[in-house]
Amino acid sequence: MRLCGFEAGLQHPFFLMAGPCAIESESLALRTAEDLRDICARLGIPFIYKSSYDKANRSSGQSFRGPGMDEGLRILEKVRREVGVPVVTDVHEKEDVSAVAEVVDVLQTPAFLCRQTDFIQAVAAAGKPVNIKKGQFLAPWDMLHVASKAKATGNEQIMVCERGASFGYNNLVSDMRSLAVMRQTGCPVVFDATHSVQLPGGQGDRSGGQREFIPVLARAAVAAGVSGLFMETHPNPADALSDGPNAWPLGRMEDLLRILQHIDHVVKNQDFPENYPEELV
């Protein structure tokens, strides 16, 4: 699949979607985007900047949600123009799709909304590439139906994203088999290495996270074979206004990406027999 000027798929090196969870300020957005751009340029990794203008599904009504659509899109447009990188953000309402699609290069749908047929099709109908996050409550094979709904609009630029599955209360687990299963959609598969270590509602009025396991799951996902990685990062995760406990420190991003590149290179120089189970008899 052609995505933001590069090729995305198992035949190609992984791409990266990364940035702070929420847009906290213009200066933070620009600085983080510049740092990530430079890191990815040194490593030769295709990069799309990610940040959200509104976190509509925070645990508490008192939690920081972001600057709102108008200010958030202004900042994302400035990042796109001044830093020179494509941008992705999530959209939560059908009514917002057209305005957001005018600014960003990739649209993302939240995991909680993946079963909302009208919403998924409204986002896909905008004609931009779409990253559909799999709900924590959904089996990986059920994403075939979600992807089919999106493609029914005529948009073939659809990606599917694994971000963990509910494992009892306040916990998620990542089943690496899901990455192979979701390839059956015919879409590039993305692994969200940071939300997968989230502990939803684990701090009472907010979500917790186990940041130390981000490299573990990222290495496993790349070894399983993915087209892209999604990682939320922050210069100071402890000070992040949203999802700090499961954000990877920006200062450690380059070292982690180097390791993941080595794994990706080895894995993609071999066949993926799991793609042809009928031959394994």
From Swiss-Prot:
What InterPro entries does its record include?
A: Aldolase_TIM, DAHP1/KDSA, KDO8P_synthase
Query: What is the official name of this protein in its record?
Result: 2-dehydro-3-deoxyphosphooctonate aldolase
- Top-level lineage group: Bacteria
The gene for this chain is kdsA
HAMAP family tied to this protein: KDO8P_synth (MF_00056)
Query: Which EC number(s) are documented for this chain?
Result: 2.5.1.55
In the record, the note on similarity to other proteins reads: Belongs to the KdsA family.
Q: Does the keyword Cytoplasm apply?
A: yes
Q: Which GO terms describe its cellular component?
A: cytoplasm
Where found?
A: Cytoplasm
